[in-house]
Regions:
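Jelly-roll (double-stranded beta-helix
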Residues: 1-243
Length: 243
């Protein structure tokens, strides 16, 4: 199945909870630091955030990072120093390349509904590029019960482009008992956003059950499959090469 596989349970993640934010961090982030958990492959941040209605992150700065946001519920209002204003909804792929430096805010514009999103940071393959922003809707493709490219450094059609040739983010919304093949790669990060899945080797001799919030980190992975439970599932898979 893989030379190495490590299962990370959702409850083991770092946790930040304040009046307007409930955030779970897969890797070291902010005040949460573990030198043994600084990321996986090229993925440095995998934050699972619930932002209360009318709240959010005020203007703050980033540089030399590829930032991908995936909304699960609600809407996100993005504003940045490039003059971009975007509303990101479920089914939208959004990428901000921080490059030489950019400031932005991320707000839940609703007065009644909480916002649930995943934000992921990936190292760029080139530092000092011009900052940029891209947003695309891929909702129709997600109905196919397949892995759909959401953010890609390899020119996948329909995906936002990231400045990292060794990384592709795939998303699948699986119906009950739906199944997809996990890409083989030096580093593969599987995160379950909703529902639950079985991660199994091709011969089905090895199997793990992953619930919402759980992740699997596969190193030098061989062929494996994700199969949704009866409730279905939404999974995000980072396929990554060598740094």
């Amino acid at each position: 199945m893989a030379d190495l596989i490590e299962i990370k349970r959702g409850e083991s993640r770092f946790h930040t909870k304040i009046d307007w934010l409930d955030s779970w961090h897969s890797f070291s982030f902010g005040p949460h630091y573990d030198p043994a958990n600084l990321g996986f492959g090229l993925l440095l941040v995998n934050n699972d955030d619930i932002i209360r209605a009318g709240s959010g992150f005020g203007t703050h700065a980033h540089s030399d990072m590829e930032i991908v946001t995936w909304v699960l519920d609600g809407e996100l209002e993005h504003r940045d120093s490039l003059g971009t204003i975007g509303i990101i909804k479920p089914g939208d792929a959004q990428r901000m390349s921080a490059g030489t430096g950019v400031q932005h805010s991320e707000i839940n514009p609703s007065s009644t509904t909480d916002l649930h999103l995943l934000q992921m940071w990936v190292l760029p393959d080139t530092k000092g590029i011009a900052p940029s922003y891209e947003q695309l809707s891929i909702s129709e493709s997600l109905a196919s019960n397949e892995l759909i490219p959401v953010a890609s450094g390899q020119g996948h059609l329909g995906a936002v482009a990231i400045h990292q040739r060794e990384a592709v983010l795939w998303v699948s919304r699986l119906s009950a008992h739906g199944s997809v093949t996990v890409p083989s790669a030096p580093f593969t990060h599987v995160f379950v956003a909703r529902g639950s899945v079985h991660l199994s080797s091709e011969d089905k001799k090895t199997e793990y059950v992953l619930a919402a919030g759980d992740a699997a980190q596969l190193t030098n992975s061989n062929t494996s499959r994700l199969t949704a439970s009866a409730e279905g599932a939404e999974v995000l898979v980072w396929e990554m090469g060598i740094k």
